[in-house]
């Protein structure tokens, strides 16, 4: 029921991946 939290988690994962690549 927390779609915002879900999206935030996805963004966090994406950011972590980008940081890893960088």
UniProtKB/Swiss-Prot annotation:
Keywords: Disulfide bond, Secreted, Toxin. Contains 8 disulfide bonds. The keyword DNA-binding does not apply. The keyword Secreted applies. Residues 1-15 have a biased composition (Basic and acidic residues). One of its GO terms (molecular function) is toxin activity. Expressed by the venom gland. Coiled coil: none annotated. Residues 1-22 are annotated as: Disordered. GO terms for cellular component: extracellular region. It comes from the Eukaryota. Its main location: secreted. It is found in: Secreted. Belongs to the CRISP family. This is Cysteine-rich venom protein collettin-a.
């Amino acid at each position: 029921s927390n779609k915002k939290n879900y999206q935030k988690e996805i963004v966090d994962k994406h950011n972590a991946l980008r940081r890893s690549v960088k």
